[in-house]
């Protein structure tokens, strides 16, 4: 497993540079011009013990869609690459997180197959310039490019900010479990097939 990676993604719509360490301590720095997005990413980093340094410029004069989507694509690709053959990792992670009146569960499988499912209240409205519906776009593209199963269930809750924050915090916690090394099987691929994509 690689410890540090620095990758870039540049299109006619976005210019992104991401420094990522899955075996970090939760240190992060963001420069995206989208404050709410940075706030959500900080929860993945902090609770996943993932170091992230993200610089992003996008066509936010139109909206934030391309910026959020392309960040998810790059982050997902880097997670998949950094995990390598996935030898020794737990592979699975799940976390149920309470945040005041909200209760959210996130479950992941880093087994190499994409699936995304969200169950919960509609994510709509805006947080500054960030459209709330972009959270689902981010999660779907992250799962697709990391080649993982990602299930998100918001069991109940009302406050829109709490709902979003609980999703990203629980995602960080679930990823932390899944990428952790299983010391009882550190030289084994966590699959009866003997390999994972």
Swiss-Prot record:
GO CC annotation: cytoplasm
**The keyword Membrane is assigned to this record:** no
The protein's location, in the record's own words, is: Cytoplasm
This protein's record includes keyword Cytoplasm: yes
Which GO terms fall under biological process for this protein?
L-histidine biosynthetic process
Q: Which InterPro entries match?
A: IGPD_sf (IPR038494), ImidazoleglycerolP_deHydtase (IPR000807), ImidazoleglycerP_deHydtase_CS (IPR020565), Ribosomal_Su5_D2-typ_SF (IPR020568)
Its UniProt pathway annotation is: Amino-acid biosynthesis; L-histidine biosynthesis; L-histidine from 5-phospho-alpha-D-ribose 1-diphosphate: step 6/9
Report the enzyme's class at the first EC level: lyase
Please give the family membership noted in the entry: Belongs to the imidazoleglycerol-phosphate dehydratase family.
PANTHER family for the chain:
IMIDAZOLEGLYCEROL-PHOSPHATE DEHYDRATASE (PTHR23133:SF2), IMIDAZOLEGLYCEROL-PHOSPHATE DEHYDRATASE HIS7 (PTHR23133)
Protein name as it appears in the record: Imidazoleglycerol-phosphate dehydratase
> Highest lineage ranks of the organism?
Bacteria, Pseudomonadati, Spirochaetota, Spirochaetia, Leptospirales
This protein's encoding gene = hisB
């Amino acid at each position: 497993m690689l410890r540090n990676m620095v990758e870039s993604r540049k299109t006619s719509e976005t210019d992104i540079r991401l420094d990522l360490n899955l075996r970090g301590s939760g240190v992060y720095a963001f420069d995206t011009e989208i404050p709410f997005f940075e706030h959500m990413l900080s929860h993945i980093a902090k609770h996943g013990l993932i170091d992230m340094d993200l610089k992003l410029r996008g066509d936010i004069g139109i909206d934030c869609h391309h910026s959020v989507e392309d960040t998810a694509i790059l982050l997902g690709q880097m997670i998949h690459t950094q995990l390598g053959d996935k030898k020794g990792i737990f592979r699975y992670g799940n976390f149920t997180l309470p945040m005041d009146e909200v209760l959210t569960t996130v479950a992941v499988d880093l087994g190499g197959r994409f699936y995304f499912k969200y169950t919960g209240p509609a994510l709509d409205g805006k947080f500054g310039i960030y459209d709330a519906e972009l959270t689902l776009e981010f999660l779907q593209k992250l799962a697709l490019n990391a080649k993982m199963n990602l299930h998100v269930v918001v069991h109940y809750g009302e406050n829109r900010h709490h709902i979003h924050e609980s999703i990203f915090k629980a995602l960080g916690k679930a990823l932390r479990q899944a990428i952790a090394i299983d010391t009882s099987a550190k030289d084994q691929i966590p699959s009866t097939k003997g390999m994972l994509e």
